[in-house]
């Protein structure tokens, strides 16, 4: 926006759009949809800007580091499935040492279909050497839960992610809902 002489918007306006990627961010910033004639050029500009800044000040949600340590101590494998393309996923996960312990990182373009299709989750299970019914998929978007259910996995809706006020994780049909990463440990202890 500022590159176009427009005032910047507060970061909290963009937060609920993060899960919708460039489409959501550009929609919030400019009121633009993919049908707009300038959308593709602006989307590529957004990608270039994102690529140069995506590792600056990037952190995981509070409690994720401790959760990963606990999973590893329990000898439980974990991975990441994102709709972000490998162009962004690979440098982002490489820049964060925590992700070196992930048994699988599957990007939105790792399979022919992105979430909510189950293919990326099934790919992650395959890379981990696990049957999908031995996996739990945690997500902060309705598409995550749809994909997890279609893959035959246990599903957990996370209320601490990028969802906005309009999202209602209790209505997504997940097997469980958690309010913090550490809540997952309590679920695992009950299993």
Task: Give residue spans per PLM region.
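A generic structural signal for short
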Residues: 55-56, 77-78, 109-110, 133
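N-terminal helical cap/lid subdomain that shapes the substrate entry/recognition surface
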Residues: 1-66, 73-74, 85-87, 99
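Asp-based, Mg2+/Mn2+-dependent phosphohydrolase catalytic module
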Residues: 11-12, 37, 69-72, 85-86, ...
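Residue-level detector of anion-binding/catalytic polar loops
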Residues: 7, 77, 154
């Amino acid at each position: 926006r500022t590159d176009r002489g427009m005032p910047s918007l507060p970061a909290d306006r963009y937060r609920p759009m993060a899960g919708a990627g460039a489409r959501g961010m550009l929609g919030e910033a400019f009121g633009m949809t993919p049908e707009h004639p300038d959308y593709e050029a602006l989307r590529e500009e957004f990608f270039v800007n994102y690529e140069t800044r995506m590792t600056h000040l990037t952190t995981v949600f509070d409690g994720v580091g401790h959760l990963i340590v606990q999973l590893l101590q329990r000898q439980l494998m974990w991975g990441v499935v994102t709709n972000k393309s490998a162009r962004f996923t690979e440098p982002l996960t490489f820049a964060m040492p925590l992700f070196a312990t992930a048994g699988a990182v599957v990007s939105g373009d790792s399979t022919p279909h992105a979430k909510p299709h189950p293919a990326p989750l099934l790919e992650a299970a395959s890379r981990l050497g696990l049957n999908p019914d031995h996996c739990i998929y945690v997500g902060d978007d309705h598409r995550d839960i749809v994909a997890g259910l279609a893959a035959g996995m246990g599903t957990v809706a996370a209320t601490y992610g990028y969802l906005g006020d309009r999202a209602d994780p209790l209505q997504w049909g997940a097997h469980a809902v958690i309010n913090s990463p550490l809540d997952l440990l309590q679920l695992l202890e009950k299993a």
